[in-house]
Amino acid sequence: VDTELPKNADQIRPALILVCGFARAGKDTLADGLQAGAINGAVKVSFAEPLKRKADQAIRDIIGPGVKFPGFQDEAFKVANRALLVELGKTCRAIRQDCFVELALDSICAPLSQGKTVIITDVRYSNELQRCADWAALRGVPLYTLLIYTDGIEAANEEEQTNFDLLLVRSATSSIGWTDRSRWKPGSADAIKRHGRGLASLMLI
C-alpha cells in the first residue's frame, strides 16, 4: 500500500486516486462509487477524453460541416469504432509516451486546490502509474491505487496486455503498491459502486 488509510475525520484530505484495469473491467463504475462517497467532492479525469475530442474533430474535418454523427461520447459509437481510438492512442504514445498523462496532470491542480479529490479512471500503462505517483509525491498529495478485474474481461489487444503486465511489474518492484485490489463477476455494477463508496469512506476523501 503506497498511502496508509487515514484513521479519523481530522485526516480528511483531497487525494489523487488511480483506477487501474483493462478496458470494460469496471473502472468507471468503481470511480462512480468513489465519487458518490466522497465527503468533500471528487472529480473524474480520463486520459482518453482528449483523445475522444480530437478523434471527433478529425472526423468532422473530414466529413465536412453540417453532417451529424454521435461522436465518441456516445457509448454505442465508441464501442463500434474503438479500433480508431486504440490506433490513434497507440500512435500518439509511440511518438510521445507521456502525452496523455501530461494533459491529465495539467487539469487536476485546480480541483485539488479546491479541496476536491481527483479520480483518474483509466490507468493502464506503467508510465501513467509512475508519472502520477511521482507527481503526487512531489506535491505531498495522498495517492491511492486501485486495481479492478472482472472475470472474462481481458486485454483488448497485445499492446494493452504487454503494457498492463509492465504496470503490474512496476507496482511490484516500486514503492507504489496497491491500496485495493478487487475481482468481480460480470453484472456486478451495483456491487462495484457500493465497494467504491466504501473505499471513499475508508479513505476519508
Model-assigned labels for residue ranges:
Residues 1-17:
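Extreme N-terminal, non-catalytic leader segments
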Residues 6, 23, 94, 99, ...:
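Small-molecule kinase domains that catalyze NTP-dependent phosphoryl transfer to phosphate-bearing small molecules
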Residues 20:
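Residues at the beta-strand->loop junction immediately N-terminal to the Walker
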Residues 28:
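Walker A/P-loop
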Residues 36-44:
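Post-Walker A helix-loop "phosphate-sensing" segment adjacent to the P-loop in P-loop NTPases
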Residues 49-118, 124:
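ATP-dependent small-molecule kinase phosphotransfer cores
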Residues 103-167:
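ATP-dependent NMP and nucleoside kinases share a basic, alpha-helical "lid"
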